[in-house]
C-alpha cells in the first residue's frame, strides 16, 4: 500500500469545461467559499467578454496565463558557508500555481471596485503584456538572468 494516495486532479469547471479555469477558481477561493470564488471568476470573464469585443474570455485568460507564468526562477542553496541564488527551471505545475498566485495578489491590490472588476482588469492587462503580474514575472526572470553565473550549482 502506498504511503500517499495518487493525485486525483481537479474536475473541470461547469461553464467552460476547462481544468485550468477550475484550478484558478480554487486559487481565488478563500475560507472554502467556492461559490463566491466561482462567481468572482465568471463575473470577471463576463466583464472581459463585454470589454474585449469579439475575443473569447477563455482565450484572453489563456494568453494572460502564458504571459504571467515564469520559465525560470532563483532558489537559494547553501554552499560552503555562502548562500547562492541559483537559477532553476520552473516545473509546469508550479508555473501555473505562481501565475495564479500573482494574478490574485495584484488584482486584489488594485484600487476600489469589486474583485471581479479588478480581476478582469488584471487579466486584460496581462493578456496585453502589461500589469503588475507581468512585471513580477519579468522581475523573477531578471533575477535568474543576473545569477546565471551560479547555474553550475544546480541541485
Curated annotation (Swiss-Prot):
Keyword Protease: no
The keyword Membrane belongs to this UniProt entry's keyword annotation: no
GO cellular component: small ribosomal subunit
UniProt keyword terms in alphabetical order: Ribonucleoprotein, Ribosomal protein, RNA-binding, rRNA-binding, tRNA-binding
A single GO BP: translation
Pfam families: Ribosomal_S7
Transmembrane regions listed in the UniProt entry: none
Family from the record: Belongs to the universal ribosomal protein uS7 family.
Function: One of the primary rRNA binding proteins, it binds directly to 16S rRNA where it nucleates assembly of the head domain of the 30S subunit. Is located at the subunit interface close to the decoding center, probably blocks exit of the E-site tRNA.
HAMAP family: Ribosomal_uS7_B (MF_00480_B)
Subunit record text: Part of the 30S ribosomal subunit. Contacts proteins S9 and S11.
Protein name (Swiss-Prot/TrEMBL): Small ribosomal subunit protein uS7
Name of the gene encoding the protein in the UniProt record: rpsG
Amino acid at each position: 500500500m502506498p504511503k500517499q494516495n495518487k493525485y486525483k486532479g481537479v474536475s473541470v469547471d461547469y461553464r467552460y469545461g476547462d481544468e485550468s479555469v477550475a484550478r484558478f477558481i480554487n486559487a481565488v477561493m478563500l475560507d472554502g467559499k467556492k461559490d463566491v470564488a466561482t462567481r468572482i471568476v465568471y463575473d470577471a470573464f463576463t466583464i472581459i467578454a463585454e470589454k474585449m469585443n469579439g475575443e473569447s474570455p477563455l482565450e484572453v485568460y489563456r494568453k494572460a496565463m502564458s504571459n504571467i507564468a515564469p520559465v525560470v526562477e532563483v532558489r537559494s542553496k547553501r554552499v560552503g558557508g555562502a548562500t547562492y541564488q541559483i537559477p532553476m527551471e520552473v516545473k509546469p505545475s508550479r508555473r501555473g500555481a505562481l501565475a495564479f498566485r500573482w494574478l490574485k495578489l495584484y488584482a486584489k491590490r488594485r484600487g476600489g471596485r469589486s474583485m471581479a472588476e479588478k480581476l478582469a482588469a488584471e487579466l486584460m492587462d496581462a493578456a496585453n503584456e502589461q500589469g503588475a503580474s507581468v512585471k513580477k514575472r519579468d522581475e523573477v526572470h531578471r533575477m535568474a538572468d543576473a545569477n546565471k553565473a551560479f547555474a553550475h550549482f544546480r541541485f
